[in-house]
UniProtKB/Swiss-Prot annotation:
Organism: Pectobacterium atrosepticum (strain SCRI 1043 / ATCC BAA-672)
A Pfam family it matches: RecR_HhH
Family: Belongs to the RecR family.
Transmembrane feature ranges: none
This protein's name: Recombination protein RecR
InterPro entries per UniProt: DNA_Rcmb_RecR, Rcmb_RecR, Rcmb_RecR_Znf, TOPRIM_dom, TOPRIM_RecR
Role according to the record: May play a role in DNA repair. It seems to be involved in an RecBC-independent recombinational process of DNA repair. It may act with RecF and RecO.
Length: 201
């Protein structure tokens, strides 16, 4: 079946999004063209503007239109000496939604993966070490993902912190709230048992 080259191009472009296959891309393209052309134009404008204007914060490497993001430039965030290391800007968003952290961040944009050729310099650890040398941190909280690569990355950064006399901690991993023990995998359950907390009255 022959279709418009522009339509094919649109569907192919939509497939760059995570979880979008050929059928999903086709549905999206037809939806925009049939029922929501104004929404499609807004999407195109927002994408164009975001791709051309959003860069990385010079301090923490998250996404921002400014040289330094709003979190890093907030004096109250600078005072407590806490830095949370995460793998992606999406992790910042998740932590901010909890309302439990009032420090600053450092975004790795990935994790160490020697098999994929990703070393310390590829995830900005040189920049993090510079900050450890010149800034006064009370604690570095390692919030990398609970994967083999995430744990290896956290261990590497913890060693860097130790070399500079900065305390490093790892976020707790364990049974999710509302979860049932029989459904939890063995590794997660092991972490939960090792990180158990006493009752305080």
């Amino acid at each position: 079946m022959q279709t418009s080259p522009l339509l094919e191009s649109l569907m192919e472009a939509l497939r760059c999004l995570p979880g979008v296959g050929p059928r999903s891309a086709q549905r999206m393209a037809f939806q925009l063209l049939q029922r929501n052309r104004s929404g499609g134009m807004r999407l195109a404008q927002a994408l164009t503007q975001a791709m051309s204007e959003i860069g990385h914060c010079s301090d923490c490497r998250t996404f921002t239109e400014q040289d330094v993001c709003a979190i890093c430039s907030n004096p109250r965030r600078q005072q407590n000496g806490l830095v949370c290391v995460v793998e992606s800007p999406a992790d910042i968003h998740a932590i901010e939604q909890t309302g439990q952290f009032a420090g600053r961040y450092f975004v790795l944009m990935g994790h160490l993966s020697p098999l994929d050729g990703i070393g310390p310099d590829d995830i900005g650890l040189g920049r993090l070490e510079e900050r450890l040398q010149v800034e006064s941190f009370n604690e570095v909280i390692l919030a990398t993902n609970p994967t083999v690569e995430g744990d290896a990355t956290a261990n590497y950064i913890a060693e860097l912190c130790a070399q500079h006399g900065v305390m490093a901690s790892r976020i707790a991993h364990g049974v999710p709230v509302g979860g049932e023990l029989e459904m939890v995998d063995g590794t997660t359950l092991s972490h939960s048992l090792a990180g158990r907390q006493p009752f305080r009255f």
